[in-house]
Amino acid sequence: MIKQEWKEKGYINEPVPEGMDLKAEIRRLCEEKNAVVLAHYYTDGAVQDVADFVGDSLALAQIAEKTTADILVMCGVHFMAETNKILSPDKLVLIPDLNAGCSLAESCPAEELAKFKAEHPGYKVVAYVNTSAAVKALTDIVVTSTNARAVVESFPKDEKIIFAPDKNLGGYLNAVTHRNMLLWNGGCHVHEQFSIEKIVELRSTHPDAKVLAHPECKSGVLALADFIGSTAAILSYAEKSDAKEFIVATESGILHEMQKRCPEKTFIPVPPMTGPCACNECAYMRLNTLEKLYNTLKYEWPTVELDETLREDAKKPIVRMLELSK
């Protein structure tokens, strides 16, 4: 029985028994219910450690499409859970907290994009995966930061393209592909917080460190980077590099996996422009906790549901992306 209080909160706030081994109980429930836990690199390290799969948006979408599990629990944000439901309509898709939104996805309401699209007939619409299902349904193809360049370059040079919603990623893609895509004016609140000044300060005290940046960062930050790439690409670069120190300009949750893969190396998160924090965290990602994950598996709620027509329309651009990424 799902309590009205839980529905109002968007998550189950039932206390877990004192002394419970949460990780063991989560694994027991997964085995009992044929469930898999998918966790994004930006979630808390404890959540990543208990997950069946940890990855970036592209990897998690590919896993969701292929897994034989009956239940998918998405420890990430809402658009990721929607993507799982789009690709796996017959599976029960759960998310530990319905409040886990995304500032970038919210910067592009579907009705506003539909109007913008109508004002620019003849343009193809390329949307970042950080969008709602309703926005995806309006697009020709979806991209992640891993495959965005390859997808954009798959279009003819003279193709007219609208890129939504991240203006920073779009600007980066325009620069590296020599395009002039029309850019939606959206941004990620985490990556928008990185500043040139903070990176210059860190470089002065760590002169041999390599600067790794996500393409959602502003152009001035990207200009200081030794490497620009998706979370998966940043991880790979750090593993292969001879450098021993890295200044990391993306959400700090990724440092957990970086340290696991490269225990002998030092990873320094770039702090936000303001505030006392030494790292830049996504508050939405941090809504995923072990307690909520346990309760979500126990009660099989909150669920993610989509209208079937919307799901079918949103699936087409995702499938095109996955086909290009094989």
Model-derived regions, located:
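Active-site loop-to-helix "anion-binding N-cap" substructures in soluble metabolic enzymes
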Residues: 1-229, 233-248, 255, 260-270, ...
